[in-house]
């Protein structure tokens, strides 16, 4: 595997994961960077993402998502709707960013769906708990944190994918440590 292929996979992994938190942030980041810089190169048919029409639509959808996701109950309805949109965004992002290295689009789409879908399931499952334990007061805070994390992950995935992989490895190690420790306490 070449360095370019590895970096493309790392970028695809990071962007698809970010899409599990907010579908439109990584899509808009990729579209804008592809349109305005040389940091992102999109091959056909994904280069359509960098058109001003698509960028405008993504910006409007992001605005709606950001506003709706801050309101208790509306955020739960939004999460149901996003159950299809976030994995689809993950599929598009994974396929678009690995298209340069020739990864089969179906395999890329499956990877993106799994990554974004997995993150979305965790997010959607945790949000009702936040609503119930904080009487809805915590929703805007948690939603804002999710949006910031999605944006930072998107930028890191493009600019420094090695760093993002290191952060994922650390997060995975911490999760495994927490899970093992929790299981030991239960015994």
Residue ranges of model-derived segments:
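Helix-coil boundary and interhelical linker segments in multi-pass alpha-helical membrane proteins
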Residues: 1-7, 34-52, 93-108, 157-165
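Hydrophobic, membrane-inserted alpha-helices
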Residues: 7-13, 90-92, 146-154
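Transmembrane alpha-helix interface/packing and boundary motifs in multi-pass membrane proteins
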Residues: 13-23, 66-70
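Alpha-helical transmembrane segments of multi-pass membrane proteins
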Residues: 58-66, 112-123, 174-177
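C-terminal ends of transmembrane helices
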Residues: 63-75, 124-131
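Membrane-interface capping segments at transmembrane-helix boundaries
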Residues: 72, 177-187
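Cytoplasmic-side transmembrane-helix entry/capping segments in multi-pass membrane proteins
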Residues: 76-88, 110, 134, 140
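Mid-bilayer segments of alpha-helical transmembrane spans in multi-pass integral membrane proteins
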Residues: 88-97, 101, 105-126, 148
